[in-house]
Protein backbone atom coordinates (compact mmCIF):
# COMPACT_ATOMS: atom_id res chain seq x y z
CA UNK A 1 0.00 0.00 0.00
CA UNK A 2 1.25 3.42 -0.83
CA UNK A 3 1.75 5.88 1.95
CA UNK A 4 0.08 8.67 -0.11
CA UNK A 5 -3.33 6.98 -0.08
CA UNK A 6 -3.19 6.82 3.74
CA UNK A 7 -2.65 10.54 4.23
CA UNK A 8 -5.52 12.98 3.84
CA UNK A 9 -4.27 16.43 2.93
CA UNK A 10 -5.54 19.53 4.71
CA UNK A 11 -8.71 21.16 3.43
CA UNK A 12 -11.28 23.88 4.16
CA UNK A 13 -14.60 22.53 5.41
CA UNK A 14 -18.06 23.88 4.56
CA UNK A 15 -17.92 26.37 7.44
CA UNK A 16 -14.60 27.69 6.01
CA UNK A 17 -12.44 26.35 8.83
CA UNK A 18 -9.16 24.68 7.95
CA UNK A 19 -8.81 20.97 8.80
CA UNK A 20 -5.23 19.80 9.37
CA UNK A 21 -3.87 16.89 7.32
CA UNK A 22 -4.29 13.48 8.99
CA UNK A 23 -3.20 9.89 8.43
CA UNK A 24 -5.57 6.93 8.12
CA UNK A 25 -6.62 5.16 10.25
CA UNK A 26 -7.20 7.83 12.88
CA UNK A 27 -7.09 7.14 16.58
CA UNK A 28 -10.27 5.46 17.73
CA UNK A 29 -11.23 4.22 14.23
CA UNK A 30 -11.11 0.64 13.00
CA UNK A 31 -7.90 -0.78 11.55
CA UNK A 32 -9.66 -1.46 8.21
CA UNK A 33 -10.16 2.25 7.44
CA UNK A 34 -6.87 2.65 5.57
CA UNK A 35 -7.71 4.98 2.66
CA UNK A 36 -8.38 8.70 2.41
CA UNK A 37 -11.76 9.24 0.81
CA UNK A 38 -14.25 12.05 0.29
CA UNK A 39 -14.40 15.42 -1.43
CA UNK A 40 -12.34 18.60 -1.30
CA UNK A 41 -14.45 19.97 1.58
CA UNK A 42 -15.02 16.69 3.48
CA UNK A 43 -12.34 14.03 3.85
CA UNK A 44 -12.45 10.87 5.95
CA UNK A 45 -10.87 7.44 6.28
CA UNK A 46 -12.55 4.51 4.53
CA UNK A 47 -11.96 0.84 3.72
CA UNK A 48 -12.34 1.10 -0.09
CA UNK A 49 -10.27 3.44 -2.25
CA UNK A 50 -12.32 5.88 -4.34
CA UNK A 51 -15.32 5.90 -2.00
CA UNK A 52 -16.98 9.32 -2.04
CA UNK A 53 -19.80 8.99 0.48
CA UNK A 54 -19.27 8.52 4.21
CA UNK A 55 -22.56 6.62 4.51
CA UNK A 56 -23.15 2.92 4.55
CA UNK A 57 -24.63 1.31 1.48
CA UNK A 58 -27.90 0.59 3.28
CA UNK A 59 -28.60 4.34 3.27
CA UNK A 60 -28.38 4.38 -0.51
CA UNK A 61 -30.72 1.38 -0.74
CA UNK A 62 -33.36 3.20 1.27
CA UNK A 63 -33.18 6.02 -1.26
CA UNK A 64 -33.49 3.50 -4.07
CA UNK A 65 -36.52 1.86 -2.48
CA UNK A 66 -38.26 5.25 -2.25
CA UNK A 67 -37.39 5.97 -5.87
CA UNK A 68 -38.66 2.55 -6.93
CA UNK A 69 -41.96 3.11 -5.12
CA UNK A 70 -42.35 6.50 -6.82
CA UNK A 71 -41.55 5.03 -10.23
CA UNK A 72 -43.98 2.17 -9.61
CA UNK A 73 -46.80 4.59 -8.79
CA UNK A 74 -46.01 6.68 -11.87
CA UNK A 75 -46.02 3.53 -14.03
CA UNK A 76 -49.42 2.49 -12.65
CA UNK A 77 -50.89 5.93 -13.37
CA UNK A 78 -49.52 5.80 -16.92
CA UNK A 79 -50.90 2.28 -17.41
CA UNK A 80 -54.34 3.34 -16.13
CA UNK A 81 -54.30 6.29 -18.56
CA UNK A 82 -53.40 4.09 -21.54
CA UNK A 83 -56.10 1.54 -20.65
CA UNK A 84 -58.68 4.32 -20.28
CA UNK A 85 -57.81 5.75 -23.69
CA UNK A 86 -58.09 2.30 -25.29
CA UNK A 87 -61.47 1.62 -23.69
CA UNK A 88 -62.84 5.02 -24.71
CA UNK A 89 -61.63 4.56 -28.29
CA UNK A 90 -63.28 1.13 -28.45
CA UNK A 91 -66.54 2.53 -27.10
CA UNK A 92 -66.44 5.43 -29.55
CA UNK A 93 -65.75 3.27 -32.58
CA UNK A 94 -67.96 0.26 -31.94
CA UNK A 95 -71.00 1.57 -30.11
CA UNK A 96 -72.20 4.07 -32.69
CA UNK A 97 -75.86 3.59 -33.61
CA UNK A 98 -76.26 1.62 -36.80
CA UNK A 99 -77.49 3.54 -39.82
CA UNK A 100 -81.07 2.67 -40.59
CA UNK A 101 -82.06 2.03 -44.19
CA UNK A 102 -84.89 4.46 -44.86
CA UNK A 103 -85.60 2.98 -48.27
CA UNK A 104 -85.02 6.36 -49.92
CA UNK A 105 -82.54 6.53 -52.73
CA UNK A 106 -80.08 9.36 -53.18
CA UNK A 107 -81.02 11.77 -55.96
CA UNK A 108 -79.36 14.71 -57.65
CA UNK A 109 -80.42 18.18 -56.57
CA UNK A 110 -81.91 19.00 -60.00
CA UNK A 111 -84.05 15.85 -59.93
CA UNK A 112 -85.28 16.69 -56.43
CA UNK A 113 -86.28 20.24 -57.41
CA UNK A 114 -88.10 18.93 -60.50
CA UNK A 115 -89.99 16.39 -58.39
CA UNK A 116 -90.96 19.07 -55.88
CA UNK A 117 -92.38 21.17 -58.72
CA UNK A 118 -94.33 18.17 -59.97
CA UNK A 119 -95.74 17.41 -56.53
CA UNK A 120 -96.87 21.03 -56.15
CA UNK A 121 -98.68 20.83 -59.49
CA UNK A 122 -100.25 17.51 -58.58
CA UNK A 123 -101.62 18.84 -55.33
CA UNK A 124 -103.09 21.88 -57.08
CA UNK A 125 -104.78 19.84 -59.83
CA UNK A 126 -108.45 19.11 -59.20
CA UNK A 127 -109.29 15.50 -58.56
CA UNK A 128 -112.28 13.97 -60.15
CA UNK A 129 -113.90 11.06 -58.40
CA UNK A 130 -115.09 9.72 -61.71
CA UNK A 131 -111.64 9.75 -63.32
CA UNK A 132 -109.38 6.75 -62.80
CA UNK A 133 -105.77 6.87 -61.60
CA UNK A 134 -104.45 5.98 -65.04
CA UNK A 135 -106.18 9.02 -66.54
CA UNK A 136 -104.65 11.31 -63.90
CA UNK A 137 -101.18 9.83 -64.47
CA UNK A 138 -101.46 10.38 -68.22
CA UNK A 139 -102.51 14.00 -67.63
CA UNK A 140 -99.48 14.63 -65.38
CA UNK A 141 -97.05 12.93 -67.78
CA UNK A 142 -98.32 15.07 -70.67
CA UNK A 143 -97.95 18.19 -68.52
CA UNK A 144 -94.32 17.22 -67.71
CA UNK A 145 -93.49 16.75 -71.40
CA UNK A 146 -94.94 20.16 -72.28
CA UNK A 147 -92.93 21.80 -69.49
CA UNK A 148 -89.67 20.15 -70.65
CA UNK A 149 -90.23 21.32 -74.26
CA UNK A 150 -90.93 24.84 -73.03
CA UNK A 151 -87.67 24.82 -71.05
CA UNK A 152 -85.69 23.55 -74.08
CA UNK A 153 -87.18 26.29 -76.29
CA UNK A 154 -86.32 28.93 -73.70
CA UNK A 155 -82.71 27.70 -73.52
CA UNK A 156 -82.37 27.74 -77.32
CA UNK A 157 -83.79 31.27 -77.53
CA UNK A 158 -81.39 32.57 -74.87
CA UNK A 159 -78.45 30.94 -76.67
CA UNK A 160 -79.19 32.85 -79.93
CA UNK A 161 -79.78 36.21 -78.29
From Swiss-Prot:
Pfam family, one: Shisa_N
Record keywords, A-Z: Membrane, Transmembrane, Transmembrane helix
Superkingdom, natural source: Eukaryota
Record's bilayer topology term: Single-pass membrane protein
One cellular component (GO) term of this entry: membrane
Subcellular location: Membrane
Transmembrane spans: 65-85
Family listed: Belongs to the shisa family.
Official protein name in the record: Protein shisa-like-2B
Organism ancestry: Eukaryota, Metazoa, Chordata, Craniata, Vertebrata
Gene: SHISAL2B
Amino acid sequence: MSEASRVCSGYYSLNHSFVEPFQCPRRGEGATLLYCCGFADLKYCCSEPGSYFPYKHSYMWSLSIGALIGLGIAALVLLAFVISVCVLCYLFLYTKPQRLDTGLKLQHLEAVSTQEGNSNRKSKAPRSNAASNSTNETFYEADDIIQEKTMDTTQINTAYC
